[in-house]
Amino acid sequence: MESLSKESYLSSFHQFPSYAPLPDHIKFESVSSKKIQCSALENISPHQYDILQAPNSRALISALKTLQEKICRLELEKTHARDRLTNLTRVAGEHKKVLESEKQSAELAAKEATNQQNDIGKQLNNAKQRCSLLEKQLDYMKEMMENADTQKTTIHEHQMLTQKEQKEIQSKLKKLEVLEKMCTRLSATHKSAETKIQHLEEKLSVEEQNRKALQDKAAQVQTSLEVNRILLSSASAQNSTQRKVKKKKQSKLKNSVSKEPPSKCFYPKAGELPFVAGKSTTSSHSLSANVQNVLHMMKHHSPQVSQKNPKTAEHKPSVLPGGSRTIPTRLISSFTGDNLSDILLALQDELGQMSFEHQELLRHINETKNTDMREDLERELDYVVKQMEIKSDQIMKLKRHQLNVNKLKKTAKLLKEQPRPTSVTKLAADKQNTGAKDPSTPRRKGDLADGSGTPNSKASLELLKSVRKIQMTLKKDDIMWEK
C-alpha cells in the first residue's frame, strides 16, 4: 500500500502541470534558471541528504528535481507575472495618460463645441434680429411704395381735375369774350338808339315849337273871325227880339253838337291809341313824347283816332247857366283815370307772367343736373327778378300817380260844383288867369270882347286845362318802361 501511494505520489510529480507555451525570452530565462538550479543541486553534498540513502532515492531525486523544476518554473512564471504586471501597469499608465489626454481633448472639444454653439446661437440671434430689422424695413418700404402709389394716383387725379378746370375756365373765358362782344354790340346799339332818340326828341321839340306857333296863329285868326261874327250877329240882332236870338243860338249849338260829337274826337279807347303803355313788348321810348303825340292828335281832332272808335257812347253835355254847352268831365276822367287803371292792370298781368316764369325757372333749376344749363337758368332767374323789381316800382309809381290824379279830379269837381260867373268881364278875367298860370297854352278866347262864344271853343279850353294839369303832374321819371 505504501508502495502504491509512493508511486501515485511520484507519478503525480512525474506528471507535469499544463501551462501555456511561454514566449521566447521567457523560455530563455527559464532555461537559464534551470541550469542555475541544476548546478545548485549538483553542488549539494550527498551527506547533507539522507534521502539519497533511501531505497527510492532515485525516485525521490527525480521528484525533487521535478519539484525544483516546477518551483523554478513557478518562480519564472512569478517573475513573468511581475514583469507582466509591471508592463500592464506601465501600459495601464500609458493608457491612463492616453485616456486622460483623450478626456482632456474631448473636454476641450466639448468646450470648443459649446463655445461654437454659443457663438452660433449668438450669430443666429444676431441673424434673427437682422431678419426682423430687414422685415421691418421691408414693411416700411412697402408702406412707402403704397404711399407713393396713392400719391401718384392723387397727383394724377389732381392733374385731371386741374385740366378739366382749365378747360372749363377756357370755355367760360370764351363765353365771357362772346358776352363782352355782345355787350359791346348792345352798348353800341344802345348808344345809337339813344342818339336816335335824342334826334327824335329834338325833332319833336322843333315840331312842338312849330305847332305852338301855328296854334297861336290859328287862335289869333279864330278870335278875329269870331269877333267879326259876333259883331255881325249883334248888328242883325238889333232888329229882332232876344227870344229869336236865343233860339238861333240853341239851334246852332244843337247842329254843331250833332255834327261833331266830342266823345268821338277827343276820347278814344286806350287800346286804340297809337301808343299805350303796358302793351308793347319791345323797348319803349320816353313817356313825354308819347303824351305830347296823344295830346297833339286829341287837340287837332285826328280822323285816324275818331274813325277807329265809331262805337263810343254819346254823352249828354252839361248845360252852363249862360246857355253854352261843355264836354262832361266824366270823359276827361276816363282819359286820366281809366287809362291809368288799364296800365296798372297790364303791368300787374306782366308781373303775374313774370312770377309764373320765376316759378318755372325755379322748377327747371331744381330738375336740371347740368351745371352750364343751371348757370344759364340762374342768370335768367336773376334777370326776371330784376324785371319784377322794376315792374313793382312801376306799379308803385303809377299807384301814386293815380292817387294824385284822383285828388286832382276831386278838386276839379269841387271847382265845377261852384256857380260860374255869367258876365263877360268875369269870363275874360278867368281866361287871363289861366293864361298866366300856363303860358304854354294858347290863349284862344283872351281877346274876346263879348262873353258869348261857341261851345266847341269852351270845351277845347277846358280839355286843354285838364290835359295841361296832367302833363304838369307827370314827369319823365315817374314811369319807366322795359329796355
Swiss-Prot record:
Residues 243-252 have a biased composition (Basic residues). It comes from the Eukaryota. InterPro entries: Centrosomal_MT-associated (IPR051756), Cep57_CLD (IPR025913), Cep57_MT-bd_dom (IPR024957). Pfam families: Cep57_CLD, Cep57_MT_bd. GO terms for molecular function: gamma-tubulin binding; identical protein binding; microtubule binding. Residues 237-261, 303-325, 416-460 are annotated as: Disordered. Keywords: Centromere, Chromosome, Coiled coil, Cytoplasm, Cytoskeleton, Kinetochore, Microtubule. Residues 420-435 have a biased composition (Polar residues). One of its GO terms (cellular component) is spindle. Required for spindle microtubule attachment to both kinetochores and centrosomes. Also functions to tether minus-ends of spindle microtubules to centrosomes. May act by forming ring-like structures around microtubules, or by serving as a cross-linker or scaffold at the attachment site. PANTHER family: CENTROSOMAL PROTEIN CEP57L1 (PTHR19336:SF10), UNCHARACTERIZED DUF1167 (PTHR19336). Interacts with clip1, mis12, ndc80 and zwint. Interacts with gamma-tubulin. This is Centrosomal protein cep57l1.
